[in-house]
Amino acid sequence: MASRAAPVRQTCCCFNIRVATIALAIYHIVMSVLLFIEHVVEVARGKVSCRFFKMPYLRMADLLSSFLLIGVLFIISISLLFGVVKNREKYLIPFLSLQIMDFLLCLLTLLGSYIELPAYLKLARPRPGPSKVPLMTLQLLDFCLSILTLCSSYMEVPTYLNFKSMNHMNYLPSQEGVPHSQFINMMLIFSVAFITVLILKVYMFKCVYTCYKFLKHMNSAMEDSSSKMFLKVALPSYEEALSLPPKTPEGDPAPPPYSEV
């Protein structure tokens, strides 16, 4: 008997959910590698502002916890890719939890930006200094990396790692004495852009959750079909059945023979 459960859709906004989820997993794997490289560069150049300056072991523990966080994010992304490729829905649960937490943090960031944006526009100043790489190239790389981080589920990770170059507020212009009308326009642009990012995160969560339901439905259907398969037994022929001895329960008398009426 076929399952009566409603079939799960294999598309999400005109995209195949498996392809979209695999692309999302690869995207976050690349982001994990970029975060690792960025953090290694920051540590090597001595630009990581550690909270424990006078305690070497605490400073080392802080750095190790940062690398451990990046490693956990990498494992979660690998788990997502492995679960989709191998059709195992339980490996998608860690990434779903990460997406929910990231969405809530992004929502709080959007609400808190209305408080911290005026202070940012007032205090942010360009930092002059010699550099071997052209300044515009560094700004472009920082901008691209900030946008990639903003659109992923790792948005709040740079805040923990103290990445000043990847702060989500960096793409806003930094100047003092902003007129009121210009400030309103900047806040409007910032709000629209951030709400667009939140909608993108909801869409990514929908893709992963739909893929999770699809894999779970497919695996349950396979288990039901395998459990309903009956064993085929070769029955004896009529002559073989007559030649077999009669089977009577032990201790019970045999049934009376048939007699003509």
Curated annotation (Swiss-Prot):
One of its GO terms (biological process) is positive regulation of lysosomal membrane permeability. Residues 246-261 have a biased composition (Pro residues). Its main location: membrane. Induction: By retinoic acid. Likely target of the activated retinoic acid receptor alpha. Coiled coil: none annotated. Disulfide bonds: none annotated. This is Lysosomal-associated transmembrane protein 5. It comes from Mus musculus.
